[in-house]
Amino acid sequence: MPITDFIINDEKTPLVLHGGPEQWKTVGPYGCFRVGICLLLVELCERFTFFEVVCNMIPFCTGRLGSYNHQAAMLNLGFIGTSVLTPVFMGWLADEYFGRNKLMYIALSLHFLGTALLSMLAFPAENFYRGAYPVFNNTSVEEQAGLFHVALLTLCLGTGGIRAVVCPPDMCGSQERESKKPMPFCNWASWSANLNAAVVFLGISSIQPLGSGALGILLPSLSVFTALVTLYLKHCDLIYRPENRCSLLTIARAFVRALKTRCLPYCHFGRDGSSWLDHAMEKQGGHHSELQEEDTRNISALLPLFSFQILYRTCLLQIPSGYYLQTMNSNRNWGGFSLPIALMNAISLLPLLILPPFMDYFSNCLLPSKRDGPFLSACMIAGNICAASSVAMAGFLEIYRKLAREQSPSGKLFSVSSMACVCLVPQYVLLGVSEVLVNPAVSMVTHRVIPGASMAFLTLSHGSACFAGAMLIKLLYLISEGNWFPNTLDKGNLENFFFVLASLMLLNILGLWRASWRYCNLNHFNAQRIRGNRCEETLLLTEKSLKFYGSTQGASSSIDLWETAL
């Protein structure tokens, strides 16, 4: 969490801390600075542990566990998706069952247990337990794989608990929801998170050449340091408690009830002209507040956008799967120095650090009147084009990589290509540029429609994209009988996988272009938002949005099937 999330004035500033909304504490500028530093350290250590596992997942699974490339890539995407979604689940457990204090201790214990088990498995023990202490030397590969999966699940639960209790997503967006200013195109909280990730990847790149022993000691040490800083925050009663509004699970539960009640009898309209969602929530009256029901109705209107987002993020997640395999099988020697794989991730973050300030200036100063209109749709379409270009470029470079294979004097071909991995930099940069364009535009659209649950629904789209990417890899592997995602890249056609993904992205772009007019007209949500009672405010905004999403209007109300097929 950046320090700028806390407003520091000359006077003492009230902060909602661990005690809840009813208990306020007065924290001065020094207290705000102390909280910011502690949260920054917690997030830095937690991110370092997470990305360290992601960067070494595929080499470990293919080298030590004997997994195929597609299995390692699917496991990596599954780990990322689970880590993205567990904060929602752990936050729900904290609010409904365990309480935030008890869950914090459980999460810290699980995080340490996961890192310790990963260190003992991944960095074996031949260097430390040779001879008298053969801890994992005598275990079979199947048992090691089972323990590895248990360690990953334990680490995911611990990471989710830390993010939910210590660094909740609501902390970044609480001040933006209360601010009367329109949401800026450049979210400085996201920019600071990207800077944090870049620092983490550079740190991993500098540590990887030291060998597995250093990494085996570092992971549990970071977990212990995270626990100490978190306990210090708990001791000083400085842990932020977000306001209890519409959570993702509450909205999903209401939407599922609505689907069960009226989805089959009423596809789009009821007998009296009102929407099937209105009938469903009327029948389920008393279960949810009016505010939650209005958010559910708005979420149903945004479903086409999030279907496009899932495929886009599936393309974006090629960095920890297909792109990693390309980098591993390319020549990483540069000037006598072996470039770590994590360095390519840091390169993909450069556009996310350089371009957002210029984009914010361009949208605010040069096009202030059109910033909330077609500009957002143009950014989303341009970002998807950049992502499709990146995947297509990866396919062509894979063809060139296989042609540039070296051979020994005896004529034996090496598995690693002579193509320098620096040639892969443009495809990483294009994915970074696409994220600069797409993520702020989608965030602004969802913030105007569902300001209370936009962060949670974006999290759901990101996590769903991880599992969708894993399913796509498995599906194409089965269809091609292993040829399009081969275990040995030189004996298969990985470029076909990239070309198929690029073709799907082109269909995604066409569908987004067809449906973009629905989201060009959402700019009035932020400008005409009425202060006061949240339920009355939501009813007014929904009344204005009905003419675009067609609960009661017959013209241009139905969503084309081919727009949502993806």
Curated annotation (Swiss-Prot):
Entry keyword set: Membrane, Peptide transport, Protein transport, Symport, Transmembrane, Transmembrane helix, Transport
Signal peptide bounds: none
Membrane topology, record value: Multi-pass membrane protein
GO molecular function, one term: symporter activity
Cystine bridges: none
Subcellular location: Membrane
Recorded GO CC terms: membrane
GO process annotations (BP): peptide transport; protein transport
Transmembrane segments: 73-93, 103-123, 146-166, 184-204, 213-233, 299-319, 339-359, 379-399, 413-433, 453-473, 493-513
Function: Proton oligopeptide cotransporter.
Family: Belongs to the major facilitator superfamily. Proton-dependent oligopeptide transporter (POT/PTR) (TC 2.A.17) family.
Protein name stated in the entry: Solute carrier family 15 member 5
Organism whose genome encodes this protein: Mus musculus (Mouse)
Gene: Slc15a5
